[in-house]
């Protein structure tokens, strides 16, 4: 599914990283707390399992993580939100 095919909104993180969300795939403060708790070192490889709209991996990027990060999401709509956010920002 393409982002153009679904209704979505854009949330902007502290350092201007954009997160695309939908009515079904959005995030709350618990996801931001998880991202801080599990934050990898700057160049460390990382995995974001059950990534949804990609808030954890995008928060890591926003906070300076530049290592390889693999985000895994089974729901096509959610994974397209992350894929499109990455493409739109050149990440």
Regions found by a protein language model. Give the residues of each.
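Conserved SAM/SAH cofactor-binding pocket of Class I
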Residues: 30-91
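Class I SAM-dependent transferase core
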Residues: 2-41
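Short, functional N-terminal and low-complexity linear motifs
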Residues: 1-6, 47-51
């Amino acid at each position: 599914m393409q982002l153009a095919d679904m209704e979505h909104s854009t949330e902007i993180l502290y350092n201007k990283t954009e997160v695309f969300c939908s009515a079904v795939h959005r995030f709350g403060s618990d996801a931001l707390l998880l991202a801080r708790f599990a934050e990898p070192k700057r160049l460390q490889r990382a995995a974001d399992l059950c990534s949804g709209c990609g808030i954890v991996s995008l928060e890591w990027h926003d906070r300076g993580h530049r290592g390889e990060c693999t985000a895994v999401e089974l729901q096509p709509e959610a994974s397209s939100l992350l894929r499109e956010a990455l493409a739109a920002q050149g990440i």
